[in-house]
C-alpha cells in the first residue's frame, strides 16, 4: 500500500471531454440502450489523455440505473465491452494497404457495382474465416457513388461501392495486417475478421484502439501503444518508472502522408465537415456508421492529439436516426474535445503526399480503344493490366462489331485490375447531310439519295418586310446536319414560304 500512481490523463481536457459527453448523451433513454465514449491519446507517445463516457462507472453489487461496470473505451480484458462495429472508419486500413502496395490516390476504381462475388476476394489468412464465396450485396449512404471514382474521392465521401472495388484488388489478409500494424485488434480478443465486408467495418473494436491507430498515421506512420501511467511513487517517496513508451513504425512516412491527404479532406469537405473546428489547426479524420446506423463514430487527429468518439447501442440494433440529433452527436462531442485539445497542444500541418503515391501504378485508358474490334480491345486492355468485359450493343455510326464506347472516359487513370466495359456498335447510324439553304425539293432529293425517306415539312411564313426570294428555301432542319441517325429517323425541314397554307 501507500503507492501514489500518476496517470497520463490531462484533467483539464478530461473535464472538457466528460462535459461534452454528458451534455449530449444521457445515462439512459427510452428510445434505445444508448452509450457513448470519447477517448484521446497523445500523438507520438501513446499517453491516454481522456476517457469519458455517458454512464458513471460503478462495479458494486448495487449499481444505480444509468451506471455501469463496463468501460466502453477499452478491450474486454481491461474491464471493457466487446467493442463496437467501427463502420467506415475501418476503410482507412484498406487505404493504407493500397498505398503500401504502391497504388495511387488518383487511381480510379469502379463504384457502380452493388453486388460482388466474394470468391473474387483474395484472402491468404488461415484464421480469417475464408475462403469466401457467394454474393455480397451492399449499398452506399445517401446515394453516393458512380461509374468511376478516384480513391481520394472515395475516401472523402466514404463510398462503399468504391471501397469494395479497392478491397477486391487487395489481399484481405494484408488489409488486416495494415490494421494490426497500427495496433488494431478486436476488443473480444478474437482475430480480426477478413471477410470482404470487413473493409466496411464489421469488426468490433474498442474506441481507445481506434484513437491510437489514427494517432499512428498522424505521427508519420509511427504507432505508439496506449499507456495510462506516467510514474509511481512508493510509500518512502521513491519514484518508480511508469509504463514505458512502446512505439514502432507501421508504415513509411510517405504512405502516412498520402493516407492523411484524403483524411484531411474528409474534415474540410467530406463526410466529417460537422467535426471541422475551423480554428486553423489541421485535422485528419474519418466517420463511421453501421448499415442500420445503430453505431456511429468520429475518429480524428491533429499532429498532437487523436480522439475517437463513439455514440450508439450498448445492446440492441435501434437506429441512431430514431434518436433526436442522433447522427450528429458524435460531431458535437468531437468538436468540443478537439477545440480544447487544440488550445492546449496546438498542431502543425501534415506533409504533402509524394507524387509517386498520387498516380501510383495506375494506367491511363487509351482513346484508341474506340473503333477497335473486340479482340483488339481485349488484347490492349488486358495487356495494360485491366479487365475486359462486353457490356452490350449500341446504335453507332462505326462499323458493326467495333467498340463504340467504354465505361470510363479516355485518359482516366484507372487502377490496375479495374474492369472496363465496352459497348459494341450495331453499325446502324449514318451521318445526316446538311441541307439548310437548299430549295425544299433539292433538299428532299439529297436526303433521299443518302437513304433518308421519312421527311416532313414545317412552314415558316416570310414576314411582310421579309425577302420573298427566300420562298421555298430550307432554313432549319431537325436533326441538324452532321448528326448520326438511323435511316428511318423522322426528319423535319423548316421551309420559308410567302404564304403557309
What are these regions (language model features)?
Residues 48-51, 89-98, 105, 162-163, ...:
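Extended, hydrophobic alpha-helical segments in both membrane/secreted and soluble proteins
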Residues 39-44:
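Short hydrophobic alpha-helical segments used for membrane anchoring or interfacial signaling
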Residues 170-187:
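Short, charged, amphipathic alpha-helices and their helix-cap/turn boundaries
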Residues 321, 340-501:
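Ligand-recognition elements built from short beta-strands and adjacent flexible loops
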Residues 1-8, 180, 185, 196-200, ...:
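Non-catalytic, structured segments within soluble enzyme domains
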Residues 103-175, 235-265:
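Conserved catalytic neighborhood of penicillin-recognizing serine enzymes
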Amino acid at each position: 500500500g501507500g503507492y501514489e500512481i500518476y496517470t497520463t490523463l490531462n484533467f483539464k481536457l478530461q473535464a472538457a471531454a466528460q462535459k461534452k459527453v454528458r451534455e449530449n448523451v444521457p445515462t439512459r433513454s427510452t428510445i434505445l440502450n444508448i452509450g457513448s465514449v470519447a477517448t484521446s491519446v497523445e500523438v507520438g507517445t501513446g499517453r491516454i489523455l481522456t476517457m469519458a463516457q455517458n454512464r458513471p462507472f460503478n462495479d458494486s453489487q448495487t449499481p444505480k440505473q444509468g451506471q455501469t461496470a463496463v468501460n466502453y473505451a477499452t478491450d474486454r480484458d481491461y474491464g471493457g465491452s466487446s467493442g463496437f462495429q467501427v463502420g467506415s472508419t475501418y476503410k482507412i486500413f484498406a487505404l493504407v494497404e493500397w498505398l503500401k502496395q504502391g497504388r495511387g490516390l488518383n487511381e480510379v476504381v469502379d463504384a457502380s457495382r452493388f453486388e460482388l462475388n466474394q470468391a473474387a476476394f483474395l484472402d491468404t489468412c488461415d484464421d480469417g474465416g475464408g475462403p469466401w464465396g457467394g454474393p455480397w450485396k451492399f449499398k452506399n449512404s445517401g446515394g453516393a457513388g458512380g461509374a468511376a471514382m478516384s480513391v481520394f474521392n472515395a475516401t472523402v465521401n466514404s463510398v462503399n461501392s468504391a471501397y469494395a472495388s479497392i478491397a477486391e484488388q487487395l489481399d484481405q489478409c494484408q488489409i488486416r495486417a495494415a490494421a494490426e500494424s497500427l495496433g488494431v485488434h478486436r476488443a473480444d480478443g478474437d482475430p480480426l475478421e477478413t471477410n470482404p465486408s470487413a473493409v466496411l467495418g464489421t469488426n468490433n473494436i474498442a474506441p481507445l484502439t481506434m484513437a491510437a491507430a489514427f494517432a499512428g498515421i498522424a505521427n508519420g506512420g509511427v504507432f505508439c501503444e496506449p499507456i495510462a501511467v506516467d510514474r509511481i511513487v512508493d510509500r518512502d517517496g521513491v519514484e518508480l518508472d511508469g509504463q514505458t513508451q512502446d512505439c514502432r513504425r507501421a508504415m513509411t512516412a510517405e504512405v502516412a502522408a498520402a493516407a492523411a491527404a484524403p483524411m484531411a479532406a474528409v474534415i474540410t469537405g467530406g463526410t466529417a465537415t460537422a467535426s471541422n473546428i475551423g480554428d486553423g489547426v489541421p485535422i485528419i479524420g474519418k466517420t463511421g456508421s453501421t448499415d442500420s446506423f445503430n453505431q456511429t463514430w468520429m475518429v480524428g487527429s491533429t499532429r498532437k492529439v487523436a480522439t475517437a468518439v463513439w455514440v450508439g447501442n450498448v445492446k440492441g440494433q435501434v437506429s441512431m436516426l430514431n434518436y433526436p440529433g442522433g447522427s450528429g452527436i458524435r460531431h458535437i462531442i468531437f468538436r468540443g474535445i478537439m477545440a480544447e485539445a487544440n488550445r492546449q497542444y496546438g498542431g502543425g500541418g501534415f506533409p504533402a503526399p509524394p507524387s509517386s503515391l498520387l498516380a501510383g501504378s495506375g494506367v491511363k485508358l487509351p482513346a484508341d480503344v474506340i473503333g477497335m474490334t473486340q479482340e483488339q480491345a481485349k488484347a490492349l486492355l488486358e495487356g495494360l493490366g485491366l479487365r475486359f468485359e462486353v457490356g452490350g450493343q449500341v446504335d453507332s455510326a462505326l462499323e458493326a462489331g467495333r467498340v463504340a464506347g467504354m465505361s470510363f472516359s479516355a485518359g482516366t487513370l484507372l487502377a490496375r485490375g479495374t474492369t472496363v466495359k465496352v459497348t459494341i456498335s450495331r453499325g446502324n447510324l449514318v451521318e445526316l447531310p446538311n441541307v439548310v439553304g437548299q430549295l425544299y425539293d433539292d433538299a428532299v432529293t439529297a436526303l433521299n439519295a443518302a437513304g433518308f425517306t421519312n421527311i416532313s415539312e414545317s412552314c415558316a411564313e416570310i414576314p411582310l418586310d421579309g425577302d420573298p426570294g427566300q420562298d421555298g428555301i430550307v432554313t432549319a432542319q431537325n436533326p441538324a446536319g452532321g448528326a448520326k441517325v438511323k435511316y428511318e429517323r423522322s426528319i423535319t425541314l423548316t421551309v420559308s414560304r410567302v404564304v403557309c397554307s
